């Protein structure tokens, strides 16, 4: 992925961000977490990632592994880790 070729449309970026922040996904609600994973998986795939869904436990929300093609096969890459559930007290 050549980041210099990405079209940064501020309105499109805000629309995409709005979908993410509007998706309530409490940790204890598997279906809600998976709805958030659906949004993330779709957006990552649209950016060129290969996306794999992983179900770690039948009562827990899925995990996503997204891989972007590296221009130099075998070279070191970058690992980004995060979570997509919303934490409630």
PLM feature spans:
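Acidic/His- and Gly-rich active-site-bordering loop/insert found
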Residues: 2-89
